[in-house]
């Protein structure tokens, strides 16, 4: 007798950035195939910057994404500065990291409260939660607005941050504004701690429990952070950022406009939980206390732990931003910018965007970009994400199809994908 196949299709995954769907094919004896369909068209950001002046290209790259434009701006800037042989002063680097932290706080708060929490409270939209969960929505918006304000102050706008330029910043705010930023961060710390306690109570579905290889940037210095020159894997491997192509292989899959990535021939994960797994020993302050008390919930074997790891990071990055502001203010007044000589060269920057490792590789010749390669966290995560959707489907394929759809979407949302970022073409 011929086997019968039942397709379960999610045409559009709700509450994620970009356009993607899931297709689960179920046969007589279980799940036959799972496809994470990325239907966002390639956007050619690398290709369109070839031949552009370096400064012009640096204004284009943040347009890849409004969710994480600061991450794109600052990673591209570092790659460009490495290419031309320029090293920014410590106080400039500290303020750039504060700008980046604004992106972290905004992105994590939006993801946790507005994209993830509705699933756990039985709502299809955060707007429908307002009456019953007014406090949670208010906290979400306060944290989100704090991150947005930080980016606006240091980047001169909430998205695309044109004030971050080669050599430093176009201008810097008054000292009193940065002092106010410290005060606002201190006021937000209890909200971040509440967020962690809230998400520590949410279920991490055991259906997707299993071994995961985690990759994260190894931070410079002795603090858990965003910038680094090496990539660290949970299998003990470390390699220089410049050798990312030797260890991480991208490949085309038929059902997706975004390529998949493997490390040592296998899917892997990046993101907040990957940072915690690889770099938890560098946490400090209240975040360190929360981590030590909740290690069993911050496991590297479950993608749902990524939600709690993001909540932990909101606590940590608030404290870290205060410390970085203190470092910069100790050297006040600060010259905003140094002159940069545009020389020929090649530079690679790996930073930790909210969703995981972000890679920029830029080659500069005669003041123009001659090569660009950008790999985003979601492009790294797609293969592992698809594997976890399969694991969930294998446990629930006999359930009501609508229930399976919800669980499959929850798996995807746990990764906090930015689908628009994940499609890229290096050469036309």
Swiss-Prot record:
EC number: 1.12.1.3
Highest taxon, organism lineage: Archaea
Root EC class: oxidoreductase
Keywords carried by this UniProt record: Cytoplasm, Iron, Metal-binding, NADP, Nickel, Oxidoreductase
Cofactor binding summary note: Binds 1 nickel ion per heterotetramer.
Cellular component GO terms held in the UniProt record: [Ni-Fe] hydrogenase complex; cytoplasm
Main localization category: cytoplasm
Natural source organism: Pyrococcus furiosus (strain ATCC 43587 / DSM 3638 / JCM 8422 / Vc1)
pH dependence: Optimum pH is 8 for hydrogenase activity at >95 degrees Celsius.
Protein name stated in the entry: Sulfhydrogenase 1 subunit alpha
Thermal activity profile: Optimum temperature is greater than 95 degrees Celsius for hydrogenase activity. Stable up to 100 degrees Celsius. Loses 50% of activity at 80 degrees Celsius after 21 hour incubation.
